[in-house]
Amino acid sequence: MGILFEVLKQDSRTRARLGRLTTPHGVVETPVFMPVGTQATVKTMTPEEVRDLGARIILSNTYHLYLRPGHELVREAGGLHRFMHWNGPILTDSGGFQVFSLAPLRKLSDEGVEFRSHIDGSRHFFTPEKVVAVQEALGSDIAMVLDECAPYPCSYKDARTATERTTRWAARARAAWNSDGATALFGIIQGSVYRDLREESTRALVDLDFPGYGIGGLSVGEPKPLMYEALEWVIPLIPEDRPRYLMGVGSPDCLFEGIARGVDMFDCVLPTRMARHGAVFTHTGRLVVRNAPNARDFGPLDPGCTCYTCRHFSRAYVHHLLRAGEVLGIRLTTIHNLHFLLDLARRIREAIAEDRFHSLKEQFLAACLTPA
């Protein structure tokens, strides 16, 4: 199966739980936030820096690596871990979301999806089987099935079509997957914001007996209460001994709300994307460091933060770097944002272990005036 997941502690007031995910490249404590390294790199960071910030598992992207440099080249290099000098676990998403959001002129059928590269316009065809083979060539610890992510808003008819196709694709991916190999394969639950579709999707994928389950099709524009409601529909239907992964979600408030409902794994480009646009997480909410009021603020980005940036540099200095277009400005905001989320996940794990998750959640959200 490639992985082993154990629940170590269940919170007494919520569905939050402390877990241990054992993979061929190391052990990961959950709940966990996974930094995103789309192109086999967490933007502006070395692998050692990412690990020193507390990351134990990262995410990379099948669509992008398939197009450039190519999965066969990565295989020749000894696999993705060796290629990018990351010795911890790697999860690769299937590329389905990118095909539907980035690739122009795509054609969808039950067989798979034909698309043109957003890089050079070349024509490609993804099937459920091919996507599994590509991820096995990359050497991922955890691979994701090809799915069809319905947009929001989406009609019930279109959502049903996408959900049923995702289930059929999942069965084909499951059959193609080498379950005796080192790569574990997760199914992806779809269904948009429709309860019956979400529940049908979950039950069908559980019947296929995947090692873990992604919850997809959320954080695509729907109001957050709808996302939280969808989690409440599906999580009770997932076996307790399987990890639950909320895909593409990673703001601090969503971490708390997802974990409270039983989510174990999160990923999101938000910390690195915000950093590139001059914004950072703080304990009172989002701060846009690029904005003029920070030009003469000689305090840290977030008082009390212990990251490298906050220990050495002021808001005024980081503001200056960002305004001047210096790469160091983006590096410093990236370091801070990744530290913020990784340290928050660590604090949440400690709180669950000590059965005080609910109070930590209430305190954090009460202080957060401007959620990301």
Curated annotation (Swiss-Prot):
<feature type="active site" description="Nucleophile">
    <location>
        <position position="267"/>
    </location>
</feature>
<dbReference type="GO" id="GO:0005829">
    <property type="term" value="C:cytosol"/>
</dbReference>
<feature type="binding site">
    <location>
        <position position="336"/>
    </location>
    <ligand>
        <name>Zn(2+)</name>
    </ligand>
</feature>
<dbReference type="InterPro" id="IPR004803">
    <property type="entry name" value="TGT"/>
</dbReference>
<dbReference type="GO" id="GO:0101030">
    <property type="term" value="P:tRNA-guanine transglycosylation"/>
</dbReference>
<feature type="active site" description="Proton acceptor">
    <location>
        <position position="93"/>
    </location>
</feature>
<feature type="binding site">
    <location>
        <position position="190"/>
    </location>
    <ligand>
        <name>substrate</name>
    </ligand>
</feature>
<feature type="binding site">
    <location>
        <position position="217"/>
    </location>
    <ligand>
        <name>substrate</name>
    </ligand>
</feature>
<feature type="binding site">
    <location>
        <position position="307"/>
    </location>
    <ligand>
        <name>Zn(2+)</name>
    </ligand>
</feature>
<dbReference type="GO" id="GO:0008479">
    <property type="term" value="F:tRNA-guanosine(34) queuine transglycosylase activity"/>
</dbReference>
<feature type="binding site">
    <location>
        <position position="305"/>
    </location>
    <ligand>
        <name>Zn(2+)</name>
    </ligand>
</feature>
<keyword id="KW-0862">Zinc</keyword>
<keyword id="KW-0808">Transferase</keyword>
<keyword id="KW-0819">tRNA processing</keyword>
<dbReference type="GO" id="GO:0046872">
    <property type="term" value="F:metal ion binding"/>
</dbReference>
<dbReference type="Pfam" id="PF01702">
    <property type="entry name" value="TGT"/>
</dbReference>
<feature type="binding site">
    <location>
        <position position="147"/>
    </location>
    <ligand>
        <name>substrate</name>
    </ligand>
</feature>
<dbReference type="InterPro" id="IPR050076">
    <property type="entry name" value="ArchSynthase1/Queuine_TRR"/>
</dbReference>
<feature type="region of interest" description="RNA binding; important for wobble base 34 recognition">
    <location>
        <begin position="272"/>
        <end position="276"/>
    </location>
</feature>
<keyword id="KW-0479">Metal-binding</keyword>
<feature type="binding site">
    <location>
        <position position="310"/>
    </location>
    <ligand>
        <name>Zn(2+)</name>
    </ligand>
</feature>
<dbReference type="GO" id="GO:0002099">
    <property type="term" value="P:tRNA wobble guanine modification"/>
</dbReference>
<dbReference type="GO" id="GO:0008616">
    <property type="term" value="P:queuosine biosynthetic process"/>
</dbReference>
<keyword id="KW-0671">Queuosine biosynthesis</keyword>
<keyword id="KW-0328">Glycosyltransferase</keyword>
<dbReference type="InterPro" id="IPR002616">
    <property type="entry name" value="tRNA_ribo_trans-like"/>
</dbReference>
<comment type="subunit">
    <text>Homodimer. Within each dimer, one monomer is responsible for RNA recognition and catalysis, while the other monomer binds to the replacement base PreQ1.</text>
</comment>
<feature type="region of interest" description="RNA binding">
    <location>
        <begin position="248"/>
        <end position="254"/>
    </location>
</feature>
<comment type="function">
    <text>Catalyzes the base-exchange of a guanine (G) residue with the queuine precursor 7-aminomethyl-7-deazaguanine (PreQ1) at position 34 (anticodon wobble position) in tRNAs with GU(N) anticodons (tRNA-Asp, -Asn, -His and -Tyr). Catalysis occurs through a double-displacement mechanism. The nucleophile active site attacks the C1' of nucleotide 34 to detach the guanine base from the RNA, forming a covalent enzyme-RNA intermediate. The proton acceptor active site deprotonates the incoming PreQ1, allowing a nucleophilic attack on the C1' of the ribose to form the product.</text>
</comment>
<protein>
    <recommendedName>
        <fullName>Queuine tRNA-ribosyltransferase</fullName>
        <ecNumber>2.4.2.29</ecNumber>
    </recommendedName>
</protein>
<comment type="pathway">
    <text>tRNA modification; tRNA-queuosine biosynthesis.</text>
</comment>
<comment type="similarity">
    <text>Belongs to the queuine tRNA-ribosyltransferase family.</text>
</comment>
<dbReference type="InterPro" id="IPR036511">
    <property type="entry name" value="TGT-like_sf"/>
</dbReference>
<feature type="binding site">
    <location>
        <begin position="93"/>
        <end position="97"/>
    </location>
    <ligand>
        <name>substrate</name>
    </ligand>
</feature>
